[in-house]
Design a protein with these regions (language model features):
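AAA+ P-loop NTPase nucleotide-binding core of proteostasis motors
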Residues: 1-208
């Protein structure tokens, strides 16, 4: 259940019944059992908090340690259920089953970037028999640009891959009339261009 904090208060009543009894019964006596069910709530609770004047401020930031992020978020989550919602019993039922995800750091960012590039390479090969080659020097250009700002997480990295690689590659293939059966090597990423562009070389492959 995505962004549970935006749910109507009545939704919490239903989940409280599930968490307490392990089942949910409607007005006609129909019962659904949750004994073999995993329920996952996701939330941005604690990212921002309100001061005494009701102004919204960022509570955690990228430069904090994971321990500090965890402490601040758990405190803010507790305040939300106890003070703002007035429903501490919900938090009591959840107990310690709260997983705090850290901000994406460079190591994780590199893994996400590599996975997205590899996925594109596989898709081009499978669908169009196009071999996309990105030498280490070119890949480093992409990495430096795509991972320069990690505050938007994995989605931000995906947006950068689309802007710096996928869209320029699509334009290059279209302008070059390349449809399939070729090897495209990215010589350089022109990340400062508007829109971003690629310098590529292409070798046509003979059909076998």
């Amino acid at each position: 259940i995505d962004e549970i904090e935006k749910a109507h208060p009545s939704i919490f009543d239903k989940f409280l019944q599930i968490l307490e009894d392990g089942r949910l019964t409607d007005g006609q006596g129909h019962t659904v059992y949750f004994s073999e069910t995993i329920i996952i709530f996701t939330s941005n609770l604690g990212m921002y908090v309100k001061d005494a004047l009701g102004q919204r401020h960022q509570n955690v930031s990228y430069d904090m340690t994971y321990d500090e992020v965890t402490r601040r978020l758990r405190e803010a989550i507790g305040d939300y259920f106890k003070l703002e919602l007035g429903r501490p019993e919900i938090l009591n039922r959840i107990g310690e089953n709260i997983v705090i995800f850290d901000f994406i750091r460079q190591e994780a960012g590199q893994a996400i970037l590599r996975a997205q590039v590899d996925k594109l390479i596989r898709r081009l090969k499978e669908q169009k028999n196009l071999t996309l080659v990105i030498p280490d020097t070119s890949y480093q250009q992409l990495s430096d640009a795509a991972l320069a700002d990690l505050t938007n997480g994995g989605r931000g990295i995906g947006n950068q891959v689309e802007a710096l690689l996928i869209n320029p590659l699509s334009r290059y293939l279209f302008d070059s009339g390349i449809i399939e059966n070729a090897t495209v090597t990215v010589v350089a990423f022109e990340t400062a261009a508007q829109p971003p562009a690629l310098r590529c070389t292409t070798t046509k492959e003979e059909n076998t």
